[in-house]
Amino acid sequence: MSDKKQKGLEWQDNPLSDNERLKEESNHLRGTILDDLEDGLTGGFKGDNFQLIRFHGMYEQDDRDIRAERQEEKLEPRKFMLLRCRLPGGIIKPEQWIEIDKFARDNNYYQSIRLTNRQTFQYHGVPKTKLQDMHRLLHKLGLDSIATASDMNRNVLCSSNPVESELHQEAYEWAKKISEHLLPRTNGYLDVWISGKKVQSSDSFLGQEDEPILGNRYLPRKYKTAVVLPPLNDVDLYSNDMNFVGIKDEKTGKLAGFNVLVGGGLSFEHGNTKTYPNIALELGYVPVEDTLKAAESIVTTQRDFGNRADRKNARLRYTIQNMTLEGFREEVERRMGRRFEAIRPFEFTERGDRIGWVKGIDKKWHLTCFIESGRLVDKPDLPLMTGMLELAKVHKGDFRITANQNIIIANVAEEDKRQIEDIARQYGLIRKITKLRENAMSCVSFPTCPLAMAESERVLPEFIDELDKIMAKHHVEQDYIVTRITGCPNGCGRAMLAEIGLVGKAVGRYNLHLGGNIAGTRIPRLYKENITLDEILSELDGLIARWATERDQGEGFGDFVLRVGIIKPVVNPVVDFWDENLIPTVAV
């Protein structure tokens, strides 16, 4: 018998990462979290629990603005938790929102709510002493935060298209079904946060807590899923591990099935050429009745073949690289018990939200409110958080958080439209903004993210102000360029699908990437490395001047810089993302 490893499993020759031990020894994700909750000597979690709380939807953070000051005073960092709610499709009820708002005001260090591009909300700054209260509140509201972080299938995205209301409802139901189907089966979340019950690993019922899909070591790495309805790519489909592109049956008007695309992901590590961003690849088409079986088969293939030795190469895109796309498809088909059909034709033309009012085919109105970087907080001149609360008090429909960090006041009856608009205008939820700002995005970064290398959310408004001036200077202010800033290369701001992407390198310095496109189907290439925001604006001034005068009719900025040779396209990131021969040494 040959000892040769099955293709894709060569990583098994190396020691497993310590995270694999942690998961296996975690008592089905319980760890000793309850003991840490009783420890008042520290505001954080110790040992394995620091990682385990991520499976419950939380990250331990601290205020980096005052970290050095507290260190000088011999104090531990001001520790607190980020919580990310599980909210497949981003739909939330006004009565739920009122309670979510109250908790943020009463218990959140920053007194804000952050809408994320994973189509949910986050709390930043929740002290350890309030964590059980927070989870019990979510439970009372019919919500939870299980599996919104760490090595699981995270919050499932779904197109927020309010116009085709019946089709959207179908897509939303599938997003919920996929989310529920891929959840962990353990009761650990409920035991720790709701009942506060300590369960020992020897307890007999633990043997029944089987994880038939995720396994007892769960997935090798984070896993992101989206459901999308063309032609609007409002979930940034190509950035996700697993994607379901809804195909409409033209006879019935209902969903016939899904094109399945896999292996997207935008994170990489500065200087590590074994890491790279990539767009999702076409796997095949499945009829709607086989959706869950396809999802499960893809996930279990990643579970069994994904790299558990090197977490930097553990995402699905690396598994596909190791197995080859054809090899991966064959393994998924074997588990699924059927072959994929040929991809059905589809096209994406844009991906931003439709800011303002739109009317659905069901005659209901939907108001999309622009929320810069998703931050709902009350500022003296812009009390957005209170505005949302006031809307929640009177709105009879629902809210939909979008994957572009905005929020839709959905299902407004004709007779209620004026009241909703008046409140939204009063609190700045309707205001004049440029198309450039509408299509900009940032991650949180400083002061709460421990991975941040440079500012992101806090510099985006001023950066867009300056870029708007450049656009006006060159008479292209009616157009827009998809612009995104992320504070480190982990990719939370999705800069690796932008026409202009800034990736934090050090405090005040960024790598500038150019050449993505409006539809979000292309990775931008590194153009300038380790430069300041002022230097970036200077570079963009010259490039936008050329775009304004030399572009073809309707040509986007990202397409233009490729066509005229300012930047070379990223054709296959596995091969050419890091190719130094393709990176400009001087501006063209």
From Swiss-Prot:
Ranges of Basic and acidic residues composition bias in the record: 1-10
Pfam families the record matches: NIR_SIR, NIR_SIR_ferr
CC cofactor: siroheme; [4Fe-4S] cluster
Reaction catalysed by this enzyme: hydrogen sulfide + 3 NADP(+) + 3 H2O = sulfite + 3 NADPH + 4 H(+)
Cofactor remark: Binds 1 siroheme per subunit.
Region annotation (Disordered) ranges: 1-20
Positions of disulphide bridges: none
Cellular component per GO, a single term: sulfite reductase complex (NADPH)
One Gene Ontology term from the biological process aspect of the record: hydrogen sulfide biosynthetic process
Family indicated by similarity: Belongs to the nitrite and sulfite reductase 4Fe-4S domain family.
Record's subunit section: Alpha(8)-beta(8). The alpha component is a flavoprotein, the beta component is a hemoprotein.
HAMAP family found in the cross-reference section: CysI
Protein name per UniProt: Sulfite reductase [NADPH] hemoprotein beta-component
Organism: Mannheimia succiniciproducens (strain KCTC 0769BP / MBEL55E)
Taxonomic path: Bacteria, Pseudomonadati, Pseudomonadota, Gammaproteobacteria, Pasteurellales
Gene that produces this protein: cysI
